[in-house]
């Protein structure tokens, strides 16, 4: 999923918080990704693209939406700092998915092989996740518009979701930087 995480915390006892609460949220596509250390980072893209976020909450109770759009199917929450005399609980945890897709994709024929149907559904979900403000190469990666991704995703979109405005917008963006 690609979108925004909202959560709220509240005290679990009678004592008031005498220090901030610091949490780290890590998003992953597969469970094993959550156990892979991020540091020291050796990737080719900037470290800031990695799907993790550290937040410091100054007072409890508190509700917040992480302002950065994130992507993943799994979430790990780590407690990085808290007063030893205070404890809290999550009161609410929601993830609001986001996409530019507004139309339903056409259904396959009822006689379609189940394996082909499964592949079609995975492809639709992947395309939907990559259709954001532009056709992205992947919501977890760099979120840049690449001409190869535009070509493939626009072709798939033409037969499925038919969001032609997104295709037109991406073409205008690329045309603006032609020279």
Briefly describe each language-model feature range.
Residues 1-137, 149, 165-170:
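Extracellular/oxidizing-compartment recognition motifs
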Residues 123, 153, 174:
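Conserved hydrophobic/aromatic pocket- or pore-lining residues that grip, position, or stack substrates
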Residues 131-142, 177-179:
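Glycine- and aromatic-rich loop/turn segments at beta-sheet edges
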Residues 141-149, 162:
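Aromatic- and histidine-enriched alpha-helix N-cap/loop-to-helix transition segments
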Residues 152-163:
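Well-ordered alpha-helical scaffold segments within catalytic/enzyme domains
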Residues 162-166, 178-179:
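Proline-centered turn/helix-capping motifs that create local helix->coil transitions or kinks
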Residues 171-177:
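Membrane-interface coil-to-helix junctions
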């Amino acid at each position: 999923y690609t979108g925004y995480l909202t959560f709220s915390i509240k005290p679990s006892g009678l004592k008031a918080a005498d220090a901030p609460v610091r949490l780290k949220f890590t998003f992953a596509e597969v469970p094993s990704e959550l156990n892979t250390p991020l540091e020291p980072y050796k990737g080719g893209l900037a470290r800031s693209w990695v799907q993790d976020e550290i937040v410091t909450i100054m007072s409890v109770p508190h509700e917040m939406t992480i302002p950065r759009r994130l992507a993943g199917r799994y979430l790990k929450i780590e407690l990085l700092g808290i007063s030893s005399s205070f404890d809290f609980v999550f009161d609410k945890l929601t993830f609001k998915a986001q996409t530019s897709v507004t139309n339903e994709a056409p259904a396959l024929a009822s006689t379609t092989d189940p394996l082909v149907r499964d592949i079609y559904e995975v492809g639709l979900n992947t395309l939907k996740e990559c259709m954001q403000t532009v056709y992205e190469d992947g919501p977890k990666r760099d979120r840049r518009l690449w001409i190869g991704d535009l070509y493939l995703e626009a072709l798939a979109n033409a037969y499925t979701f038919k969001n032609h405005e997104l295709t037109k917008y991406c073409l205008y963006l690329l045309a603006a930087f032609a020279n």
